[in-house]
Amino acid sequence: MCYTSSMPDTLLEGLNEEQKKAVLQTEGPVLIFAGAGSGKTKTLTHRLAYLMVEKKVNPYKILSVTFTNKASKEMSQRVSNLFAEIKNLKFKIKNSGAPLPWMGTFHSICVKILRREVDKSELKYSSNFTIYDSDDQKQLIKRIVKDLGYDPKKFNPGLVSALISSAKSEFVDSSKYKKLANDYFNRSISEIYKNYQKRMIDSNAMDFDDLLTNTVILFKSHPEILNNYQNQFQYIMIDEYQDTNEPQYQLVKLLSQKTNNI
């Protein structure tokens, strides 16, 4: 996609001086500190548009990540509205059928990558994997607790699910969890965790934590795949970066290694 004409005022309209600086500083890392409702999302929207319009960056080279589907939809709508204003100013856009920026949550971006690449890896999944939500996880854990003969009152599915999720967010698998366990309860959790993960793999299913950790594992074990995405994503923008957990942080770090345009 290629854009012509001088920069329209719309790209900076309504921004304060600090926001304008963030929009115009496109190379290297930029961190915006601001409270809720202070215009961070608006700044990211204008920065994304500035990259495409003024810097003539192919939208396919831009990755925009949010933490919720609601925020992702809001960002997409804001970008669409901003471009509508630009078009109304007779700002010409060439090749409008070109790919749009990659926009979505960490999880949706990981799903997209894994659907494309997981068959090329040693991960024990195929590209048509299913995704378990919290209810699916709890039902599976409930069955495992029953099959292993544990007291369902002591091993509440919600609690067990949270403990497994916490372990995965630190890249602690069931065998490592077992080594770290120092009492009956945690040794039992490690056994539930082991069975949980085996049944997930046997069902070709991932939970939300798997989506993140498996993408990190994929990139680390296949540098050639990582290289392709590093070359693609020349600019990475993340809403609410301070809320990233370890797998999300590692994903961003891996993807931004070449350009550091984040």
Stretches with model-predicted labels:
Residues 2-124, 131, 227:
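P-loop NTPase Walker
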Residues 43, 74, 155-159, 210, ...:
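Alpha-helix N-cap and coil->helix boundary residues
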Residues 49, 80, 142-146, 197, ...:
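Amphipathic alpha-helical segments within well-ordered protein domains
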Residues 13-24, 28-32, 63-64, 71-72, ...:
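Conserved helicase NTPase motor core
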Residues 48, 110, 114, 167-172, ...:
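Short alpha-helix boundary/capping elements
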Residues 26, 97-100, 120-210, 233:
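ATP-hydrolysis module of ASCE/P-loop NTPase motor domains
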